[in-house]
């Protein structure tokens, strides 16, 4: 690009002017610009973003698809390691199996340890409603229960739990729409998917203004993506 990496806003505007989309590719450049800017001023990226609000960041553990007993054992083990949130993978099997796994995991969690049932788009709307209503006594959130934004929107008022969007939360515009339309109670955000730290900062501020919680992590990118998410 031949540009000053500390002019992060102009770098992003230039990329957007010559190439639509491709946010994963742009994210790498955006994160590199933030890194270069922080180093040039001798400060951390989090300080550029307004200052660190904590020195230790709570995380969550993902429990993969397994038997109810296996899922419960995994959740209990990582609860003892100090994880304050357990994300249980569901979907891709019968509704009855998902319900059994959710109940088994919920039974071993201590008060204060939060539970998310993450279908990663695997449920139909019917399955999401069945599982939620069958587990309405269990405090948890439903993360990306169905594949499309429209399907998840149709669940509002029919499920007994808050809905978090993950794969459908592809950019700031979708986050704004989901909040305004009452579709999402929270979000699972990926730094690389939305285009980098600059876009994630905007999502953070919108969620803060609307009092919507969100996670910040990434599926790919290794230590670099993890470091960007941490800041």
Q: Language-model segments: which ranges?
A:
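N-terminal small/glycine-rich loop or linker at the start of catalytic domains
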Residues: 16, 40-65
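Short coil/turn connectors at secondary-structure junctions
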Residues: 43-44, 54-59, 81-84, 111-112, ...
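Active-site loop-helix segments enriched in His/Asp/Glu that coordinate
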Residues: 53, 57-59, 65-77, 94-109
């Amino acid at each position: 690009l031949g540009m000053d990496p500390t002019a992060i806003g102009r770098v992003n505007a230039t990329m957007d002017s010559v190439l639509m989309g491709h946010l994963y590719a742009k994210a790498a450049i955006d994160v590199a610009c933030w890194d270069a800017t922080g180093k040039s001023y001798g400060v951390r990226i989090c300080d550029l973003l307004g200052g660190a609000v904590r020195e230790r960041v709570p995380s969550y553990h993902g429990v993969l698809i397994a038997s109810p007993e296996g899922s419960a054992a995994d959740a209990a083990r990582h609860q003892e390691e100090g994880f304050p949130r357990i994300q249980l993978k569901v979907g891709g099997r019968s509704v009855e199996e998902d319900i059994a796994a959710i109940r088994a995991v919920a039974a071993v969690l201590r008060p204060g340890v939060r539970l998310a049932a993450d279908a990663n788009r695997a449920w139909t709307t019917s399955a999401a409603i069945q599982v939620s209503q069958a587990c309405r006594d269990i405090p948890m959130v439903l993360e990306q229960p169905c594949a499309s934004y429209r399907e998840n929107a149709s669940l509002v008022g029919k499920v007994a739990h808050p809905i978090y969007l993950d794969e459908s939360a592809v950019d700031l515009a979708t986050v704004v729409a989901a909040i305004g339309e009452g579709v999402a109670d929270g979000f699972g955000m990926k730094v690389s998917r939305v285009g980098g730290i600059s876009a994630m900062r905007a999502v953070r501020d919108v969620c803060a203004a609307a009092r919507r919680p969100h996670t910040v992590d990434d599926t790919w990118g290794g230590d670099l993506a993890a470091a960007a998410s941490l800041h």
